[in-house]
A protein has these predicted regions:
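Short beta->alpha junction loops/turns
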Residues: 8, 62, 146, 182, ...
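N-terminal beta1-alpha1 cap of cysteine-dependent amidohydrolase-like domains
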Residues: 1-78, 84, 90, 103, ...
Length: 242
């Protein structure tokens, strides 16, 4: 079984429906967990999130989820953080003040710099336009390292993003994929048995569902995050919409 943590923020239902869509052919139950529990009763944990880092981490702690989450990671349970859920895995965030994260993945969450330029839009005169913050829309995933989470994901695949802050990973080996939005930043990471994905898989159509299916395939095979222990996710029985 996979536990999706409900700590009162964001995109819970859409993430649940996306997991449900890929879980059915694998016959892996997906539960929404809205109270602190011993997560080792499940085979993996998903931490979704949408909104401000400070509100999210405060909700998580206020509802008593921090300790059981850390104990689950320490026990080797696979953990997947999505969007703000990914950011919470890092040490700290500078979003609207300084906030302490869960210290699962080394690094910090930082705001996109002001005045970023997009060289890809330069007209003949060489001028570029200023990129807007937040980044909202489709952008590419540039694969940097092999990982079973990214099986069958082509380099340059498009995913859907909506965020003003990015994860600055302290360990280069943690970076699985990067995305260019004025700066080249980590968009998919992994540290031991914890993974994080900045784009919204539930909004990223076939690519997003493939990433979730890959995660579930690893869980089904009993993978606890060892490199190279991938599992075949199988074909996705759903229309390609991008």
């Amino acid at each position: 079984m996979i536990a999706i943590v409900d700590y009162g923020v964001g995109n819970l239902r859409s993430v649940y429906k996306a997991f449900e869509a890929v879980a059915l052919p694998m016959q892996i139950p997906v539960d929404i967990v809205d109270a602190p529990a011993d997560f080792t009763r499940w085979r993996a944990v998903v931490l979704p999130g949408q909104g401000a880092f400070g509100d999210s981490v405060n909700n998580l702690r206020r509802q008593g989820f921090e300790t059981p989450l850390l104990e689950a990671v320490q026990a080797g349970l696979p953990l997947l953080g999505i969007c703000v859920g990914m950011q919470l895995l890092f040490d700290e965030s500078e979003e609207m003040g300084q906030h302490e994260g869960l210290h699962i993945i080394p690094g910090a969450v930082r705001r996109f710099p002001d005045g970023m330029r997009d060289p890809a839009t330069a007209p003949a005169n060489g001028l570029t336009h200023t990129l807007r913050v937040p980044q909202i829309g489709w952008n590419q995933l540039h694969l940097r390292r092999f990982d079973p989470l990214l099986a069958d994901i082509p380099d340059g695949a498009h995913a859907y993003f909506a965020h003003s802050y990015y994860c600055d990973a302290a360990a280069p080996d943690a970076i699985l994929a990067t995305t260019d939005y004025g700066i080249d930043y980590p968009s998919i990471v992994r540290w031991r048995n914890a993974w994080g994905i900045q784009p919204h898989p539930e909004k990223s159509h076939t690519i997003g569902l493939r990433i979730l299916a890959n995660f579930m395939a690893m869980v089904a095979r009993g993978c606890q995050g060892e490199e190279g222990e991938g599992a075949e996710a199988g074909p996705l029985d759903m229309p390609s919409v991008r």
